[in-house]
Amino acid sequence: AKYDAFIAALTEALRVIAGAFEVHAVKPATEEVPAAKIPAGELQIVDKIDAAFKIAATAANSAPANDKFTVFEGAFNKAIKERHGGAYETYKFIPSLEASRSKQAYGATVARAPEVKYAVFEAGLTKAITAMSEAQKVAKPVRSVTAAAAGAATAAGGAATVAASRPTSAGGYKV
């Protein structure tokens, strides 16, 4: 039941975010707020996350009940790696980042206030999309092993800093 609630909540969050991006992207230029324009790279990241999520959900649905989350996490990370190609080399902390985002998103489903659930989903997905978009911008088709390892170490250090500074409650509600 917990896994099903998590999948339903994350599916809905991705659907809403992708829909908002699509609607926002087709506004006439006169209505567009310059600071709020969504870069094409971020729209591509949302599509890649959505595709990876669908693959992982399909794989997890056929797994035994006790293994669903583990199968989902592994399939999601594998699909993200396959879809990011060279960008993944500079973003090697995806498994730990996505696992922490998944756990954070699941934690939000047990929060008592709906606004806390929404805030946690929004913050987690925004951070993941932004980080993936930035990694994709700096990725080169051919990278040396040393440069890729250095990028991964730097990124992992940044992820640890973000995780350490994350509050345990939002809006006075326990998350």
From Swiss-Prot:
Transmembrane segments: none annotated. Pfam families: Pollen_allerg_2. Keywords: Allergen. It comes from the Eukaryota. The keyword Acyltransferase does not apply. Gene3D superfamilies: Group V grass pollen allergen. The keyword Cell inner membrane does not apply. Belongs to the Poa p IX/Phl p VI allergen family. This is Major pollen allergen Pha a 5.4.
